[in-house]
Every structure is written in C-alpha cells, then in structure tokens.
C-alpha cells in the first residue's frame, strides 16, 4: 500500500461525461479519460483492505458482492499509484481476458463492495481498469502472444459473445487449435449487437479480435451452426465443442393488439441501429433501421437494455419516451435490510434516463405500470397503448408476492413505437436440438452443479446459455471455467489457473 492516507487525502474523481444535450448528437462513447497523473491519485485512494470484498465475487442475498473474476483490484490500484502501469496490466490480465469490455459495460460490482464506500465514495476501480487497458494498447503492451507449442487438439466454440471469446482465448493460450463460429457477420455477440456504440464502441471489439486472430484463433462468421452448418459435422471434425450461444430468446408481452405494426423486441431495435451506423460511416440512413424519429416511444422494461433503448430512441429524434417498470421505485439509499457489502438495491439514474430528463424535462420511468392493451389504427399500425397500474399482493396459497393489476387504474397514451426489453428466456432451441443436449425448466443447458459438460459426450456449455441472462463479467468467468474443464478433459490435467 503505497499511500496509507490516500483515501483521506484525495477525493474520488470520475471520468467527465459530455453533457446530455451534447452527447445525444452522436453515437460515440462520451466520457473523457483522466490524465495519467490524475488516475494515479485515484489508485492511491485504495485502502488495501485486510479483507478486500471488492475482489470476492461471492453471492450475498441472491446477488454478487465484488468481482466474479476475482480481479486483484487492490494490487493494480497500488501499482498505478506507483507508476507501474505495465505490471498493473499484467496483473489485470491474469484474471480478466477482456478489461477493454468490462471497464466500459460492467456495473462495477467491485466498487459497490468497496470498504472505502462505507463512509465516503468508493475507489474508482472501474475507471482505473479502463486507464490500465487503454494505456496498455497505447504503449504496445497489449499485443499478440501466440502459443509456442500446439497440442494437436481442436476445439469448436459456437458463439462469439464474452463467454465464447474467453474460452477461446484461454484454450488457444494452452496450445489447442480453436475455431469460433458466429452466425452474425462479425464476431462479438451481444457485445457488438446488444450493447449500443455509445457504451462500447465497436472498434474496441475489432481491436481485440485482431489480436486473437494473430494469436491463431480462427473466426468463421455467417455460420449458423444447427441450421446451415450441421452439428454432426462439427462433432466429427473437432475434439471438443463448447456451446456459448447466449440467452437470445426475448421474453414477450402478452396483451391484446400485440400483432400491431410498430412493436419490436429491444435487441432487434438496438441491432438494427448498430448495423445501420456501421454501414453508413456512423450516420443513420433512413429506411435502414427501426426508427424512433418523431415517434412516441414506449420502452417496456427497466433494466440496462431498457435504458439503452431510451438513449438510442433519443438519438434517433423521438417525440417522447416512456419507460415502464413493473416494480416500485427503489430507495435512493441503502435500507437496513440491504447492508454493505451486499449489492445496493437503490435507484440509479443511468445515461439514457439522464438524457430523457434533459430533453423532455422529466424522468421517463413510470413505476408499477404495464401495458394492458395495444391499440391499432385501421391499417393495423400501433397508435396508442392502454396502461394499467400494478400493486404488490401476496398469494394466499404460495405466500409469494406478485404484482397484480389495480382495477380501474387504466389510462391511454399515444404510442407509435413499443420496444420490449423484458429480459430473455434462454437460448434458441435449434442449437440444443441439433446437438441433442438437455435443457432445464428455464431452458438453460443442463449440467451438473459447478460443471460445464452436457449429457452429450465432448460437448460443453457456458455463459448465458448455461447460467441464464447475466452480466458480461459472469459470462467471462464461465468462459474461463469451461476452458479449464475442456482442457482437463483433453489433456488429463490442466495448467489453466483460474482465480
């Protein structure tokens, strides 16, 4: 610990964000990095706790506390304070294959478990992580390092999201020949088409993919395994197969009028925008995407994807935006029932909501509300939505609390575009059926607890396809763990050390 009083001497300093009214004019990342000197002082704020909850990644009250990757946060915080940026990068790389992704899109579980955050603002570990990886690219530390020896074993990874990429990265380091199959035109999975460019610029993905290709990983895009590529051919050609296809089945909304023109799943909306931007030099060309321009938009869902839809709709030029949340508004601060270091169940106003407040003058979120009916015009186009309030009631038979409609609370609003961001229900079943793997009642691939091997010999599963919809950081962890299990099955032992 290079600065024992750092947390008292220096205040937290975050990367400055461009103002909401300015950043909605573009689709680029909108935070300005701190100078290296400023970032080093942020590293000095780390207390080097005796029990560093920031790196624990343990479940508490049903949520993770600390980093699931067990990143050595206090170590690299101290290293950057002392100016040892290369060593900080090497220490970060030990536990995290993709800090360029997590430092942009992770909700910073480490910071919410930070001991410093008990009495003042937490250490800016996410910002420090960003600075470490970007400095590594700038200085040439982040570069290809192909394995010196090949094992002669071949592994197929189906899906190029964070879990598939993490598994491919580690297995390639071990010396296995890895081929990643991706049904889309470019690798990245949800990183590319499920997360907007203003949160994760796509050249950041391309930069890392280029290194992985230089290290010997083969990417085959436009290959839809289970449809235009036979599972039997994959099983015949490769020694092991990892299914990492994500949780791509969106949860639908059942309401009269659901067939109206103008209702889309959030992932299709976000994907169409990203594809249109990259096809037209980061400009939206009319007719090439699902447009919110001039429309009254309703976003159904209060999570990260819903917020992304709010921010994207505003950049399109939406006339109005409402975001519906089934649950009541969370408290502004922790309650006694939600103590540190549990994940804080508090109200967070994210970038999209901040932008809506700046543009429209009010928070777009409407709590304890859902759609009762979609109203169509004579041509079948969506024109209005009937909303209804919800309240919490306890089921007398099960004792479970559930949100139920409040009779007589209906009201009607204008709606030209509805975006359903209600979560996902597992992977599309044509892949699991093609390989013959079993799924559980939640439609996730079925394995033994703590294991990744499926009921089919030599076939493994990881990521959201295995654990269900989750965070990028959890997907990376699953990719690392499945790589270790696959390596051991191939070699009889493994030297892939996972924290």
Language model: regions and residue ranges:
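FAD-site-proximal beta/loop scaffold in flavoenzymes
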Residues: 261-294, 394-469
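Feature captures the FAD/FMN-dependent oxidoreductase FAD-binding
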Residues: 87, 149, 154-158, 206-256, ...
């Amino acid at each position: 610990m290079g600065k024992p009083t750092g947390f008292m001497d220096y205040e937290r300093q975050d990367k400055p964000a461009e103002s909401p009214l300015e950043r909605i004019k573009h689709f680029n990342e909108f935070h300005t990095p701190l100078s290296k000197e400023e970032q080093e002082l942020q590293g000095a704020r780390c207390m080097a706790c005796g029990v560093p909850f920031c790196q624990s990644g343990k479940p508490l009250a049903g949520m993770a506390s600390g980093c699931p990757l067990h990143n050595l946060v206090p170590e690299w915080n101290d290293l950057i304070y002392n100016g040892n940026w290369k060593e900080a990068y090497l220490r970060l790389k030990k536990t995290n294959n993709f800090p360029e992704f997590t430092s942009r899109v992770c909700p910073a579980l480490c910071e919410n478990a930070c001991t410093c955050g008990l009495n003042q603002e937490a250490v800016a570990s996410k910002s420090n992580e960003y600075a470490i990886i970007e400095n590594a690219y700038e200085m040439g530390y982040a570069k290809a390092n192909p394995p010196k020896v090949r094992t002669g074993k071949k592994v197929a990874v189906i899906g190029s999201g964070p879990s598939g990429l993490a598994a491919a990265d580690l297995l390639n380091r071990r010396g296995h020949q890895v081929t990643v199959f991706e049904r889309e035109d470019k690798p990245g999975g949800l990183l590319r088409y499920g997360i907007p460019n203003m949160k994760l610029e796509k050249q950041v993905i391309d930069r890392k993919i280029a290194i992985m290709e230089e290290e010997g990983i083969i990417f085959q895009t436009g290959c839809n395994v289970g449809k235009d590529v036979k599972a039997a051919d994959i099983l015949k050609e490769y020694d092991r197969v990892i299914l990492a296809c994500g949780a791509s089945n969106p949860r639908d909304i059942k309401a009269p009028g659901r067939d109206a023109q103008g209702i889309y799943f959030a992932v299709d909306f976000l994907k169409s925008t990203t594809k249109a931007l990259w096809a037209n030099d980061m400009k939206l060309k009319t007719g090439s995407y699902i447009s919110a321009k001039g429309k009254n938009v309703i976003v159904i869902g209060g999570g990260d994807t819903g917020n992304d839809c709010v921010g994207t709709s505003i950049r399109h030029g939406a006339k109005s935006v409402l975001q519906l949340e089934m649950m009541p508004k969370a408290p502004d601060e922790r309650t006694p029932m939600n103590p540190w270091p549990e994940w804080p169940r508090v109200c967070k106003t994210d970038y999209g909501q901040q932008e809506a407040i700046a543009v429209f003058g009010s928070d777009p979120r409407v709590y304890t509300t859902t759609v009762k009916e979609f109203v169509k015009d004579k041509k079948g186009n969506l024109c209005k939505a009937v909303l209804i309030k919800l309240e919490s009631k306890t089921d007398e038979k099960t004792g479970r609390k559930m949100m139920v409609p409040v009779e007589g609370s209906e009201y009607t609003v204008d709606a030209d575009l509805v975006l359903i961001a209600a979560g996902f229900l597992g992977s599309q079943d044509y892949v699991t059926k093609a390989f013959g793997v079993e799924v559980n009642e939640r439609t996730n691939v079925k394995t033994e607890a703590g294991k990744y091997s499926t009921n089919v010999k030599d076939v493994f599963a990881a990521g959201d396809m295995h654990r269900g919809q989750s965070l990028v950081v959890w997907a990376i962890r699953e990719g690392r763990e499945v790589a270790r299990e696959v390596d051991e099955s191939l070699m009889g032992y493994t030297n892939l050390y996972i924290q």
